[in-house]
């Protein structure tokens, strides 16, 4: 280590350091002149034999190395002279690393560089100091180039240099731009499509190099192509798309059932208009309601006429004389529609001042039935809303008809007159009540059976 300390105090090295630290403009030229002088001394053969020791050539070789590296550093000094101290510290470190390397090289080059010696020094005698000197000169040049390349490789590994030119120099219009995908650095001029000012200076803009943009375009095209490839898969899915078509008949069936329900009510109205009793089955589609109304109608028809119910219905209808006509119209119409032939005859009798011979004629019921058809069809909605009529009997309907005629004039008096007219009209139609009640019971039973059958069919369909 003492030898290395003595080597650092070499006058040529100190002179080179002085030129390196100096801020004068001529320092670079003086340093170059010193380099040339040291190189001339190194080549001079008369100077080499005079030095018996091997160490002085080592010193000269280290000087050569140091001076070779100094011009590079000094070339950057005019741009920034303040960096001289930092560079000298790096220089000293490099020198300290080189000296042990020189000793190793002197041992290695004796075996490695012997074939090179005859080519370089044919006229000279191969004395040991010359061989050591020449071997040291050659590896030093190689070492310097190796260190330069290693520094460049280090900069490349760290990602600090341009990928194209492998340099870290940055000019005003030639900055290093980083690709956001591969994170490689490019000079703006080195990149083949030159980077514009907008791309380089806009911090919001993400810049990609040409290679990465090509790769990204390929990836984008690949990602767009796969949806086109499974087009046959979409065709294979079409059976699944056909499933809704299979399901559509079910929806159609549901629509048909709802539509049939409407048809069913229309059919029921037609049967009711044809002369069957208990219009409750027309108004309500629920089977429980139908059975209740039909049973109630059968019981009341077998029990006979009840004037109290008739009076209650007429009183309810005549409670408000202004609205009673509107409320009683559907009652009278449904009564017309649901009454049997005997009932129609009794209505005619009550309207025609109780003549017993008229109810036996068939034409009047036909005409009345037609009028009932037209009126009941026009007032279906009203009869569905109102419906005190289902509980009315055959004589009740006739009494309500007569009450309709009288209720427009007076409320309670109309009800009393309707009672009297119903009593008077019941006497001529008494002979016809028996068969009409039986017919109504039979019709109610038939309807119940039909409703039960239809309900069972619905359940089976579901």
Curated annotation (Swiss-Prot):
UniProt entry tagged with the keyword Metal-binding: yes
Annotated stretches, region: Disordered: 42-132, 301-462
Ranges of biased composition (kind: Low complexity): 347-358, 382-437
Bias type Basic and acidic residues, positions: 88-124
Originating species: Homo sapiens (Human)
Highest taxon, organism lineage: Eukaryota
Alphabetic keyword roster: Isopeptide bond, Metal-binding, Nucleus, Phosphoprotein, Ubl conjugation, Zinc, Zinc-finger
PHD-type zinc finger span: 159-215
Protein's UniProt name: Integrator complex subunit 12
Ubl conjugation recorded as keyword: yes
Localization: Nucleus
SMART domains: PHD (SM00249)
Record's compositionally biased regions (Basic residues): 449-462
Family, as annotated: Belongs to the Integrator subunit 12 family.
Polar residues composition bias: residue spans: 59-86, 301-328
Entry GO MF terms: zinc ion binding
Role of this protein: Component of the integrator complex, a multiprotein complex that terminates RNA polymerase II (Pol II) transcription in the promoter-proximal region of genes.
Gene3D superfamilies from the UniProt entry: Zinc/RING finger domain, C3HC4 (zinc finger)
Post-translational modification: Dephosphorylated at Ser-128 by the PNUTS-PP1 complex, promoting RNA polymerase II transcription pause-release.
Post-translational modification Phosphoserine, affected residues: 128
Subunit description: Component of the Integrator complex, composed of core subunits INTS1, INTS2, INTS3, INTS4, INTS5, INTS6, INTS7, INTS8, INTS9/RC74, INTS10, INTS11/CPSF3L, INTS12, INTS13, INTS14 and INTS15. The core complex associates with protein phosphatase 2A subunits PPP2CA and PPP2R1A, to form the Integrator-PP2A (INTAC) complex.
BP GO annotations: regulation of transcription elongation by RNA polymerase II; RNA polymerase II transcription initiation surveillance; snRNA 3'-end processing; snRNA processing
Annotated transmembrane regions: none
């Amino acid at each position: 280590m003492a030898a290395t300390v003595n080597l650092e105090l070499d006058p040529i090295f100190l002179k080179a350091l002085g030129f390196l630290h100096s801020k004068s403009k001529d320092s670079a030229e003086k340093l170059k002149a010193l380099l040339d002088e040291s190189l001339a001394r190194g080549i001079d053969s008369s100077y080499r034999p005079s030095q018996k020791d091997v160490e002085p050539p080592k010193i000269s070789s280290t000087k050569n190395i140091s001076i070779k590296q100094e011009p590079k550093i000094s070339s950057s000094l005019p741009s920034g002279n303040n960096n001289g101290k930092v560079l000298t510290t790096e220089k000293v470190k490099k020198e300290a690393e080189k000296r042990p390397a020189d000793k190793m090289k002197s041992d290695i080059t004796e075996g490695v560089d012997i074939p090179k010696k005859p080519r370089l020094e044919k006229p000279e005698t191969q004395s040991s100091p010359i061989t050591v000197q020449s071997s040291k000169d050659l590896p030093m040049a190689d070492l310097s180039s190796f260190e330069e390349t290693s520094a460049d490789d280090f900069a490349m590994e760290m990602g600090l240099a341009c990928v194209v030119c492998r340099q870290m120099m940055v000019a005003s219009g030639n900055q290093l731009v980083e690709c956001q995908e591969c994170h490689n650095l490019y000079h703006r001029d080195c990149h083949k499509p030159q980077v514009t000012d907008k791309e380089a200076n806009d911090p919001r803009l993400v810049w990609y190099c040409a290679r990465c943009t090509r790769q990204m375009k390929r990836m984008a095209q690949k990602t767009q192509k796969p949806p086109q490839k499974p087009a046959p898969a979409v065709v294979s899915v079409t059976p699944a798309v056909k499933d809704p078509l299979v399901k559509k008949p079910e929806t159609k069936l549901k629509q048909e059932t709802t539509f049939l329900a409407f048809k069913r009510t229309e059919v029921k109205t037609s049967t009711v208009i044809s002369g069957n009793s208990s219009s409750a089955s027309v108004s309500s589609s629920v089977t429980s309601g139908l059975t209740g109304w039909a049973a109630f109608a059968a019981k009341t028809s077998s029990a006979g006429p009840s004037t109290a119910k008739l009076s209650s219905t007429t009183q309810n209808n005549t409670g408000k004389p202004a609205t009673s006509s509107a409320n009683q119209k559907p009652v009278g119409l449904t009564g017309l529609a649901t009454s049997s032939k005997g009932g129609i005859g009794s209505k005619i009798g009550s309207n025609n001042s109780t003549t017993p011979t008229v109810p036996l004629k068939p034409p009047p019921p036909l005409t009345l039935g037609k009028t009932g058809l037209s009126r009941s069809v026009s007032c279906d909605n009203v009869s569905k809303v109102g419906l005190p009529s289902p509980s009315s009997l055959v004589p009740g309907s006739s009494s309500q008809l007569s009450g309709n005629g009288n209720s427009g004039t007076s409320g309670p008096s109309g009800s009393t007159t309707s009672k009297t007219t119903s009593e008077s009209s019941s006497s001529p139609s008494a002979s016809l009540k028996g068969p009409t009640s039986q017919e109504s019971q039979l019709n109610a039973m038939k309807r119940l059976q039909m409703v039960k059958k239809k309900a069972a069919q619905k359940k089976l369909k579901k």
